[in-house]
Amino acid sequence: MPRYALRIEYDGGPFAGWQRQAAQASVQGAIETALGRLELGPHTIAAAGRTDTGVHATGQVAHCDLAREWDPFRLAGALNAHLKPLPVAIVAAARVSEEFHARFSAVERRYLFRLLARRAPEVHDRGRVWRVPHPLDAEAMRAGAAHLVGRHDFTTFRAAGCQAASPIKTLDALTLETVEGANGTEYRFHLRARSFLHNQVRSIVGTLERVGAGAWTPDQVREALDARDRAACGPVCPPQGLYLTGVGYPADPFA
């Protein structure tokens, strides 16, 4: 059966996450339903990252096996037609080898978290950023973030119910970009690693927000990391500011 890689964009707001749910809308379920309108199923697709409820994606990657050969451009267009009016889009499709696996072939995942500091409620970015009503110290947050880059035991920064076999991960990059606007300052956290633990990004950003607000010192981030205790973590920030922006492979399937 020919295998296809799909690059996917979605607004996570209306969905109970990526993974198929028995009684709730999911991104996986929406795409599998669209595939079923192209070819008789059942269809099961696998993704590089199983995003949680409310988490968005601009560069999710999944793969599917189909019964016949499709022109990748036409496949993407046909799926998009059947996905309407849901906020899900197949940005690109590519024919790949049977050895390609969206999850297990991935060597890098990239996330963005958008944090907006302003007193007034967000309007145009509602559901797409985490808003806090107080100013933040970007340099303090960068200093705190520096403690987390590299290979560490991230027990403190993973969900209590995380099912990963090991809490040890290598965070390859964690950078902070500030965007000054007329109506507030947006802080954009960019994170890159081969893989992440459940709630790792939201735990890190929630903790760094406390540093930016002055409630924590940058060195307390290191102390929390060294504690290897979930109770030492700062607040876990809400999901709506989180985006899966890209997945890396040894060879780009969409090139």
From Swiss-Prot:
GO biological process, one term: tRNA pseudouridine synthesis
Domain of life of the organism encoding this protein: Bacteria
Active site, UniProt feature: 52
Catalytic class of the enzyme: isomerase
Catalytic activity: uridine(38/39/40) in tRNA = pseudouridine(38/39/40) in tRNA
Keyword Plastid: no
MF GO annotations: RNA binding; tRNA pseudouridine(38-40) synthase activity
EC number of the protein: 5.4.99.12
Keywords for the protein's UniProt record, in alphabetical order: Isomerase, tRNA processing
Pfam families named in the record: PseudoU_synth_1 (PF01416)
Binding site for substrate: 111
Purpose of the protein: Formation of pseudouridine at positions 38, 39 and 40 in the anticodon stem and loop of transfer RNAs.
Family: Belongs to the tRNA pseudouridine synthase TruA family.
Subunit structure: Homodimer.
Protein name: tRNA pseudouridine synthase A
Annotated organism of origin: Cereibacter sphaeroides (strain KD131 / KCTC 12085)
Lineage of source species: Bacteria, Pseudomonadati, Pseudomonadota, Alphaproteobacteria, Rhodobacterales
Gene this protein is translated from: truA
